[in-house]
Amino acid sequence: MTPEEVSREVRRIEITTRHLVRDIVAGEYSSAFRGRGVEFAEVREYQPGDDIRTIDWNVTARLGAAYVKRYLEERELSVLFIVDMSASGGFGTRLRTKGQLGAEVAAVLALAAARNNDRIGGLFFTDRVEYHLGPAKGRRHVLRFISDLLAFAPAGTGTDLGAALAELEPTLRRRAIIFVLSDFMATGYESVLGRIARRHDVVGLHLIDPRERELPAAGLVTLWDPETGAWRRVDTGDAELRAHFARRTEEFDRGLDRLMRERGADLLRLETGRPYAEPLLSFFRRRERMLWR
């Protein structure tokens, strides 16, 4: 993208997603990540959009106005986006590619976090770490992150999520929310993911495309692996091959679900051919219920 195209796309995302950003912030965003184990900091007067469960009823009764409790994480929380920029992100057969879906979802979540006065940071990776932006607050910073995300042209093509998480780990001095946006077609990241998830909120956003889940019966086709450059000719008219492909996909999904659960991370699947607003809102509602039950 040219700088002018990037600016237009940033503005488009801001305009078309502003209601979603508002709904995320006004809904369960804060309570979905600030549940147990937070440190009390102070009380302040209630403001529209505050979680009513944080109202300090003793102070409210004494002063005759609604006051809420604030916690340390409300002022110290960082939201980090670990974004897979490998070549497989260029695949998409519906509304957008996986990479475009990941970029827009990361932009929406970054805008929501900025509106919540959280710090925003990012790390982009392929088979190497290619970009690392330290967390900071402010509209200018979040717009820089989104612009960099949209304009980024990676040097690598492969995927090494383990290397990305290993570089991130020593920089995490305070509790953080970490969104990992990837198709997770990688290995060797399990241990470092578990270490990070023990101290931080880790959410995997699994970016998928329907054609990666089910092959059409289109006869002989040539498939290309964008990360390795390998070509393979297959007969998609073979029902047994298509069934095997579908089974392998299901096995991959179950394995990823199990891995995330065992390592203490959360997981949400987002598909290139479907709107992502409701899945995001449902995810925050589900996390909120789990933390406050």
Region spans (language model):
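Helical mechanochemical/support elements of P-loop NTPase systems and associated helical scaffolds
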Residues: 53, 75, 141, 157-160, ...
